[in-house]
Amino acid sequence: PLGIENDEIFDFQTQHTAIRIPLNQVIYIETSPQKHYVILHGTNNQMTFRANLKDLEKASPSLVSCHRSYLINPNNIIRINKLKREVEMTDGSICPFSRTKAKMLMDTFKRRNLQ
């Protein structure tokens, strides 16, 4: 079963492996070209495992869906380009976002910067 115990730890299991990562080290998660797999991009590593984004999104309210193929950690956003519909992450990665997610992303980014 997949799951995130709390806002501090991203905790998930595959058939043969159990992995725990501090949530602040999760930059984003994207769907893999390999069916039924996702790729987690972390600050120190990248992992591919069997899962789907909908289950991960339900398990972790801290991660937000910016596009049907991406879940991002809003704490790791450094820039949002509304014209190109791109989010730049702390590791330099660029993630696309859909038009329907633009307002939610901007609001989340502004709220985070006010804290």
Set out the residue ranges of the language-model regions.
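Conserved binding/recognition cores within well-folded domains
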Residues: 1-90, 94
